[in-house]
């Protein structure tokens, strides 16, 4: 309670909170687009069942080429009606939200509640977060970037490798 009262609890929002607003979950998103490629659906399903979503995204990106960026933007860049428990976030957490989501659901929830974020940072600028919070700013940290640009995006295996390395 004490930590929460100080505003030191920061929610980490994943894709599940956007599904109720009509955005696809990762499995649905990836499976939806293999029909547009020559990827073997059974092999692709095996990759997904193994939980290797970054590898599945990489295969899809390789198969679609430049169209992959458009596919991501079309799936997650459209404004949809906000629904579900994500709407409670602005009423529970006031200073910062960290998300891996590409969509704008969290940002729009805070705007609708009259608590817009002072600033939105992509993951590549996450080191600035402590300073921004110390300045009293309400920050949305989009760790994996946004749907509107591949710059700073972390979705495919190559993008994970570029931003996070091999994990050692």
PLM regions with names:
Residues 1-168:
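Conserved catalytic-core helix/loop/strand module for nucleotide-ribose chemistry
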């Amino acid at each position: 309670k004490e930590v929460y009262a100080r505003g030191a609890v920061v929610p980490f929002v994943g894709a599940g909170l956007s599904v109720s607003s009509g955005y696809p979950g990762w499995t649905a998103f990836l499976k939806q687009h293999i029909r547009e490629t020559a990827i073997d659906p059974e092999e692709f399903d095996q990759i997904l069942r193994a939980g290797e979503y970054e590898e599945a995204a990489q295969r899809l990106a390789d198969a679609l080429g430049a169209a992959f960026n458009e596919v991501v933007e079309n799936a997650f860049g459209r404004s949809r009606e906000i629904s579900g428990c994500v709407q409670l976030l602005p009423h529970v957490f006031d200073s910062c939200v960290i998300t891996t989501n590409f969509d704008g659901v969290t940002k729009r929830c805070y705007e609708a509640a009259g608590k817009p974020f002072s600033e939105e940072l992509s993951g590549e600028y996450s080191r600035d977060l402590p300073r921004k919070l110390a300045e009293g700013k309400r920050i949305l940290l989009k760790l994996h970037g946004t749907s509107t640009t591949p710059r700073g995006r972390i979705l495919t295996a190559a993008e994970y490798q570029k931003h996070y390395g091999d994990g050692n």
